[in-house]
Regions:
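Flexible, membrane-associating and regulatory peripheral segments of lipid-active enzymes
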Residues: 1-108
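Catalytic His-Asp charge-relay segment
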Residues: 107, 239-245, 264-266
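Serine-dependent carboxylesterase/thioesterase catalytic core
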Residues: 109-119, 123, 127-235, 244, ...
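Acidic catalytic loop of the alpha/beta-hydrolase fold
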Residues: 246-252, 273-274
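Short loop/helix-cap segments at secondary-structure boundaries that form the rim of catalytic
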Residues: 255-262
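A hydrolase-biased, glycine/serine/histidine/acidic-enriched motif that marks catalytic-domain neighborhoods
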Residues: 259, 268-269, 290
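Post-His helix in hydrolase/transferase enzymes
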Residues: 277-289
Length: 292
C-alpha cells in the first residue's frame, strides 16, 4: 500500500496548493473550488501530453483523428482522474486480498501495471464478484526493481489461490505490465487450469519506457533483452486466452507492440491505456467471454 500512501500525499499536496491560490480574503467556497480544480487540471494536462507524445512516436496512422481524438481525450481523462485521484489513493485501502471461498465459478486474480495498485480494479472487481466469481487482487513491487521479483510475488499468490480451490479455474486478468507478468507466469507454470486475459500489455515493449530505464528495469523498451528473449521462446496463448489492446493506447507506443498476432488478439479503437481497464463496454464483453 506504499503507492496508495504516496498518491494520498500527492493529492493532499495538490489540494493544498489549489486552496493556497485563493486570496486570503476569499470565501471558503472559493478556496474549496480552487483546491478541487488544480488536481483536475493536472490530470487534463498529463492526458494531453501523453496523447501528443504517442502521436509523435507512433507513425502507424491508426490513431484517432479529428473529433474522435477529442472524445478519446475526454474518456481517458475521466479514467485517469478516477484511477489516480480516487480509486488508487483512497479506495484501495478497502480492498481485501481475496474473497471468501463460496463460489463454484472460476477465480479471478486482477494484476495491475506500472505505477498502479489494486485500486485500479475497484469497479471491475465489484462487477465480477456480483456475477458469482471469487476475486482476488495483488499489489506488486515497482516494476523497476526487477520483473522476476514481480513474478515471484505473483506466483506466490497464484499458488495460494490454487491450493485453496484446486478444482476451480484461475483467470489472471492483467493490465499493462500486469498483462506481461501474467503471460510470463502462465508460460512458466504450464497449468491447464490457468487462463490469461491481458489488457493493453506492452508484450513487445513501448518507446515511452526510455525514461524509466527500460532496457533492464521498469517498463520494457522494444529493445529490452529480457523481453526479446522471453518472446523468442514463449508458448502461444491458447484459444481461451484474451489479449485486448487499442490502436489509441498512448502508453504502449507504437500501439501495435501489444499485438501477439494470435487467436487471442482482440483489437479495439478509441480507448486509451487506462480507459481499457475502466470501460463498461469492455467489462461487459469480458463477462460474456468468460461465461462461454
Amino acid at each position: 500500500m506504499r503507492l496508495a500512501s504516496v498518491l494520498c500525499l500527492l493529492l493532499l499536496g495538490l489540494l493544498w496548493a489549489g486552496a493556497s491560490m485563493a486570496d486570503q480574503d476569499g470565501s471558503l467556497l472559493h478556496q474549496a473550488a480552487l483546491a478541487l480544480i488544480l488536481p483536475v487540471l493536472v490530470v487534463l494536462a498529463l492526458t494531453i501530453l501523453g496523447s501528443l507524445l504517442a502521436g509523435a512516436l507512433d507513425r502507424s496512422g491508426q490513431r484517432a483523428r479529428g473529433w474522435r481524438r477529442w472524445v478519446w481525450w475526454g474518456h481517458e481523462s475521466l479514467a485517469f482522474g478516477w484511477c489516480f485521484l480516487i480509486a488508487q489513493p483512497l479506495l484501495s485501502w478497502f480492498m481485501p486480498g481475496s474473497d471468501a471461498l463460496r463460489s463454484q465459478r472460476a477465480q479471478l486474480l486482477f494484476v495491475h501495471g506500472f505505477v498502479c495498485n489494486r485500486g485500479l480494479w475497484w469497479r471491475w472487481r465489484q462487477a465480477f464478484r456480483a456475477e458469482g466469481y471469487r476475486t482476488a487482487v495483488i499489489d506488486l513491487p515497482p516494476t523497476w526493481w526487477n520483473i522476476q521479483k514481480q513474478l515471484a510475488r505473483l506466483d506466490s499468490m497464484v499458488q495460494r489461490l490454487r491450493a485453496e480451490a484446486p478444482a476451480l479455474p484461475l483467470v489472471l486478468v492483467g493490465h499493462s505490465m500486469g498483462g506481461v507478468a501474467a503471460r510470463m507466469l502462465w508460460d512458466r507454470l504450464n497449468d491447464p487450469l490457468l487462463r490469461v486475459v491481458s489488457i493493453g500489455a506492452p508484450h513487445h515493449g513501448t518507446e515511452l519506457a526510455g525514461g524509466f530505464g527500460g532496457r533492464r528495469h521498469g517498463p520494457p523498451l522494444p529493445s529490452s533483452d529480457w523481453l526479446i528473449q522471453f518472446n523468442a521462446t514463449a508458448r502461444s496463448l491458447p484459444e481461451n486466452a484474451v489479449n485486448l489492446w487499442s490502436t489509441d493506447d498512448a502508453i504502449v507506443v507504437p500501439a501495435g507492440s501489444s499485438a501477439l498476432d494470435e487467436s487471442s488478439d482482440h483489437v479495439l479503437g478509441g480507448y486509451g491505456h487506462l480507459g481499457l481497464s475502466q470501460s463498461d463496454e469492455i467489462l461487459q464483453w469480458l463477462l460474456r467471454r468468460l461465461r462461454d
